[in-house]
Amino acid sequence: MGMKLHGPAMSPAVMRVIATLKEKDLDFELVPVNMQAGDHKKEPFITLNPFGQVPAFEDGDLKLFESRAITQYIAHTYADKGNQLLANDPKKMAIMSVWMEVESQKFDPVASKLTFEIVIKPMLGMVTDDAAVAENEEKLGKVLDVYESRLKDSKYLGGDSFTLADLHHAPAMNYLMGTKVKSLFDSRPHVSAWCADILARPAWSKAIEYKQ
């Protein structure tokens, strides 16, 4: 029984897992979930993720949800496959873990709100809340200031090598690069170079093909 990833490829959380699977050069089945029809809140999906959110993931008899837990499982379990996505000693692993937490607690909440307001709402025919955009642009700028300082001394957030701490940013960055928010990244040279590096990875190019 092979790996199955449940969810729409348009979802940043689903894309986070697809990118990890592609970095590891692993075969998997992407199982569509019609969120507009509310299928993520019904059986059989709700058995896989009782919170009714995408993605859900199966590897044999193992069932997981929460995208970052899934990516860590893949990176650890298939460490000998594809590209290494984890730090290689306890201290480096701790630093990587710090920046994984920063992504989930500081970067993603703000980036997700901006993506919703600037990208998703127009797609759904909804009106963008300009005040919310301005507020979250300011918040994102402050986060990216910290990143700029970190990336002056380190090629990647976790150290010299690309890890999950960097990969986890890719879906939100990919959406924001097509909006005016791109200027927040471009105006910080180390952040800009880091972002370009991540989005130019072959595995990411393969991952975004699923959105077509």
UniProtKB/Swiss-Prot annotation:
GO molecular function, one term: glutathione transferase activity
Any Gene Ontology biological process: glutathione metabolic process
Gene Ontology CC terms: cytoplasm
Pfam families in the record: GST_C (PF00043), GST_N (PF02798)
Matches recorded under InterPro entries: Glutathione-S-Trfase_C-like (IPR010987), Glutathione-S-Trfase_C_sf (IPR036282), Glutathione_S-Trfase_N (IPR004045), GST_C (IPR004046), GST_Phi_C (IPR034347), Thioredoxin-like_sf (IPR036249)
This enzyme's EC code(s): 2.5.1.18
Domain GST N-terminal: 1-82
Domain GST C-terminal per the UniProt entry, residue ranges: 89-212
Binding site residues for glutathione: S11, P12, A13, H40, K41, Q53, V54, E66, S67
Key words of the record: Auxin signaling pathway, Transferase
SUPFAM superfamilies associated with the record: GST C-terminal domain-like, Thioredoxin-like
Catalytic function, reaction form: RX + glutathione = an S-substituted glutathione + a halide anion + H(+)
Record-linked PANTHER family: GLUTATHIONE S-TRANSFERASE RHO, GLUTATHIONE S-TRANSFERASE-LIKE
Family: Belongs to the GST superfamily. Phi family.
Function text: Conjugation of reduced glutathione to a wide number of exogenous and endogenous hydrophobic electrophiles.
Record-given protein name: Glutathione S-transferase
Lineage of producing organism: Eukaryota, Viridiplantae, Streptophyta, Embryophyta, Tracheophyta
